[in-house]
Regions:
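Residues lining hydrophobic/aromatic ligand-binding pockets adjacent to catalytic sites
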Residues: 1-212
Length: 212
């Protein structure tokens, strides 16, 4: 099945379940940028619960800026702060040390635009997960109903402000988490959480994460 997805910053597990199950993906790069979404936000685990990490961005002043034109901000040394938070959260996880160099290399690359940064992170995560679903960036805003009527349009399906709905077909399969004795199981965090805690077995959670 062809799936339409938005750009996302270290996207949640549900997003990667869809990547795993898809035959091909088109990533929307011409929609209007939406604030307070996974496009520039991810959730990682901490001893006190989920921690949101938000990428500061710069727009061209228009209220409806295409996401492909949204630039990364240099404000406040956010990359260093985000990486410190990620390392602190997962340095004691079983697989962080094996993936750290690859993740760090992609994270600290030189990027001007948010979508390119997100795509680089997605690509390295897919490589570490062994996912080979082809992902193509859109060349224009897609009218799904007329252009891809058989596609599954999930461009607005994921939000950090709400839990994954059962009707979406996503099933949050429990797995080992570093802080679960303190916080209980935290569902649908960033793919980083699954990858660092389960390593190669993360694919099994992605495989079983959608209802038939």
């Amino acid at each position: 099945m062809l799936v339409l997805l938005s750009s996302a910053y270290f996207a949640p597990i549900e997003y990667y379940c869809r990547l795993y199950a898809a035959d091909a993906v088109i990533e929307e790069r011409h929609e209007h940028y939406l604030k307070q979404t996974y496009r520039n936000r991810c959730l990682i685990a901490t001893p006190t619960g989920p921690l949101p990490l938000t990428v500061p961005v710069e727009r061209n002043g228009a209220s409806h800026t295409p996401i492909g034109e949204v630039r990364l901000s240099d404000h406040g040394g956010w990359k260093r702060l985000h990486w410190q938070a990620i390392a602190s959260a997962y340095e004691s996880s079983p697989f962080f040390e094996y993936y750290e160099d690859d993740l760090r290399g992609a994270f600290f690359g030189e990027y001007e635009f948010l979508v390119d940064f997100n795509a680089a992170l997605r690509d390295v995560c897919c490589e570490l997960l062994g996912l080979h679903t082809p992902v193509t960036p859109s060349t224009h805003y897609i009218n799904a109903a007329s252009e891809y009527p058989e596609a599954l349009d999930l461009r607005t399906a994921f939000s950090p402000k709400k839990s994954a709905a059962a009707e979406s077909g996503f099933m949050a399969r429990p797995y080992y988490q570093v802080f679960q004795e303190r916080t209980g199981f935290l569902p649908n965090l960033s793919i980083l959480d699954l990858l660092c805690n389960l390593g190669p077995e993360a694919r099994l959670v992605l495989r079983d994460g959608l209802q038939a």
